[in-house]
Amino acid sequence: MLKINQIKLPLTADEHDLRRAAGKALRLDENRIRTLRVTKKAVDSRKKDNIFFVYNVEVDVDGDENAILKRCGSGVETVKKVDFTPPEVKRTSELRPVIVGFGPAGMFSGLALARAGFKPLILERGSHIEDRQKDVQTFWRERRLNPESNVQFGEGGAGTFSDGKLTTGIKDPLCRFVIDELANHGAPEEIRWSAKPHIGTDRLAEVVRNIRKEIISLGGEIRFNCKMTDIIVANGYIHGVKTENDGHFEDIETDTVLLC
C-alpha cells in the first residue's frame, strides 16, 4: 500500500480526476491502481482567485511498490499501518474492574475492557444521554441547573454538547483508531478523511448511545446517576469504591479502578 500526499485538484474534480492524478503522481497507468482510499481532504483557500482541494490518498497498485517508490518524488511513501491491539492481560482476579466516568476516556476504556472479556462496571454521576438531553434543554430554556446532569456531567462527557469538532495537535497514529470507532458507531463517514472532522451534537448522541449498547452487549454494566465518593484502600492496595446513588450508599468490591 502506498500513500500519496498533497494531490491538488480543482473544486470541480470528481473521483475519476483523482484516480488520474494519483496515477500521474505514481508515474504509472491509472488502470494499475486496484484500490484508492481518501485519507484526508482539505480546501486550500489562501488565494481567493485559486481555491482548490488537497487530497492525501492510499492506493493499492498492480506492480512492485519499491520500484514505483524509487521513481516517484517525496510526496509518495509506503503506508505505515498502525492497528490498535490491546496487550494481552492475564488477569486472575474475579472482581470486575471499575471505570469512574463515562466521557471519552471512560467510553473507550469500557470498549477495550469489554472486548477483552473483563465485563467492566462503569460509574457515571450524570444521566444517560436521553435524560441528559432533557436536563440540558431545561437549563438552556428555563435556566434551571441539574448539578449532576448537565453540559459537563453525564453520558459522553462534556464533548457530547461541544458540537463534535475532532481536532488535536498530536500526531499519535492511534488517533485513527478513535476516528474509525466513532465512524463505526454512527458518526459521518467523512470524518475518516476530512481535514477538520466534525460530527455534530445530534450525531454525537447516537454515537455515544451505540458505544454504550456495545459495552452492555459484551457483559459490561453502566450505572448512571451513580457517584463515586471514595476509594477503599487497605495496606496500600485498592479494595473497592464507595458510591452514592440518589441517597443510597454502596461499597463495591474491586481491585482495579480507572479514573476517567
Residue ranges with predicted function:
Residues 2-95:
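Extreme N-terminal leader/targeting segments of oxidoreductases
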Residues 24, 111, 115, 213:
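Short, well-ordered alpha-helices that flank and scaffold nucleotide-derived cofactor binding pockets
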Residues 37-42, 224-239:
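A conserved short coil-to-beta-strand element within the FAD-binding core of flavoproteins
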Residues 48-52, 137-222, 226-227:
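Conserved N-terminal/central alpha/beta ligand/cofactor-binding core
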Residues 92-128:
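N-terminal Rossmann-like FAD-binding beta1-loop-alpha1 element of flavoenzymes
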Residues 93, 247-256, 260:
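Core beta-strand elements of the Rossmann-like FAD/NAD(P) dinucleotide-binding domain
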Residues 132-137, 171-172, 233-243:
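Short acidic, glycine/serine/threonine-rich loops at helix termini
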